[in-house]
């Protein structure tokens, strides 16, 4: 009996350890996350701080056409989730530049004032340094807000604006209760791999698949780092940026060819947890927001995907990549 109880105790401990190790501890600059292509760093000095922006610069693999595309990631992501898009674009002759924005991915987690204007400026400087005169700009989620700001500020630099399920199609501050950055920081500190998975399942995807776990492993892995409070503070600062700096009132000012790619089942709302279920049902309805946004942008085209959520390039990669390359 004693041996049996010891065996049970050992089994519980063993499986508990397996569960605890399921999400590895990651550094907040993702030093132990392998990116699909070599990572370089662009030095920046701002607010008296020397910081660095990580980026991948991937050459075309065949039939170089002399054109460039820059990819802007979403708030909960980094350059690591663009692999299939990079391959598709380099295969048709594009040079592809993939930055991790300051505060995200492998870039510095700086305590600064975050703004889409400043981010756009840094990306323009990066492109200038790399000798890029004009580029296709593809932005996903938060990257869609940044891509919009970039196109508004630098239309001469923007060959085409491509928006994949961008956030900011609603003015969140008109219906999401205001909370301070300090309050959002406390919320971010409570993040776990399980809470990340639950949010992704409920907002981002129509049906959860094991291959999506890599997104949770990264977003959840950093929560185990001793430096996670710094990550959480930056996440709170960029939440405030999104909340306070809408771009939707300027869609009509865009002067570049624009295409929206919309997964119609997306229900993303920034600050969703601050709403009741009834309130949530009134917002984040991309099957409506996509068309409404396209109507605001002169000459915009919209490509919608049924049975697809927030990240078409991951959820329906073949269909998305065909639509993407066909829009260039």
Question: What do these predicted regions represent?
Answer:
Residues 28-60:
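N-terminal cap/lid segment of alpha/beta-hydrolase-fold proteins
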Residues 42, 224-290, 295:
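Conserved serine/cysteine hydrolase catalytic core
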Residues 45-49, 56-59, 91, 101-138, ...:
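Active-site loop/oxyanion-hole signature of alpha/beta-hydrolase fold enzymes
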Residues 139, 143, 147:
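Gly/Ala-rich beta-loop-alpha elbow adjacent to hydrolase catalytic centers
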Residues 148-152, 161-191:
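Flexible "cap/lid" loop of the alpha/beta hydrolase fold
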Residues 191-250:
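Conserved alpha/beta-hydrolase catalytic His-Asp/Glu region
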Residues 287-328:
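Catalytic active-site module of serine/aspartate enzymes centered on a nucleophile-bearing elbow/loop
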């Amino acid at each position: 009996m004693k041996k049996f109880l010891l065996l049970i105790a050992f089994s519980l401990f063993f499986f508990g350890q397996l569960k605890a190790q399921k999400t590895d501890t990651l550094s907040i600059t993702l030093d132990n996350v392998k990116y699909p292509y070599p990572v370089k760093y662009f030095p920046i000095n701002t607010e008296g701080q020397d910081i660095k922006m990580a980026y991948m610069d991937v050459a075309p693999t065949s039939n170089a056409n002399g054109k460039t595309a820059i990819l802007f990631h979403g708030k909960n992501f980094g350059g690591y989730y663009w692999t299939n898009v990079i391959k598709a674009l380099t295969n048709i002759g594009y040079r592809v530049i993939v930055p991790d924005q300051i505060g995200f991915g492998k870039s510095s987690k700086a305590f600064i004032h975050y703004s889409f204007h400043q981010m756009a400026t840094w990306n323009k400087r990066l492109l200038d340094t790399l000798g890029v005169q004009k580029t296709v700009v593809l932005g996903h989620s938060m990257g869609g807000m940044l891509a919009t700001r970039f196109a508004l500020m630098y239309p001469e630099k923007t060959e085409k604006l491509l928006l994949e399920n961008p956030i900011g199609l609603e003015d969140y501050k008109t219906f999401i209760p205001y909370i301070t950055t300090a309050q959002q920081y406390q919320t971010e500190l409570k993040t776990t791999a399980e809470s990340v998975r639950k949010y992704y399942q409920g907002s981002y995807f129509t049906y959860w698949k094991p291959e999506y776990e890599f997104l949770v492993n990264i977003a959840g892995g950093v929560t185990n780092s001793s430096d996670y409070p710094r990550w959480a503070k930056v996440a709170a600062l960029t939440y405030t940026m999104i909340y306070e700096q809408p771009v939707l009132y300027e869609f009509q000012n865009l002067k570049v060819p624009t295409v929206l790619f919309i997964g119609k089942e997306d229900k993303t709302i920034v600050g969703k947890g601050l709403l009741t279920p009834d309130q949530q049902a009134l917002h984040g309805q991309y099957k409506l927001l996509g068309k409404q946004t396209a109507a605001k942008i002169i000459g915009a085209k919209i490509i919608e995907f049924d049975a697809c959520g927030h990240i078409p390039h991951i959820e329906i990669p073949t269909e998305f990549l065909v639509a993407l390359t066909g829009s260039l």
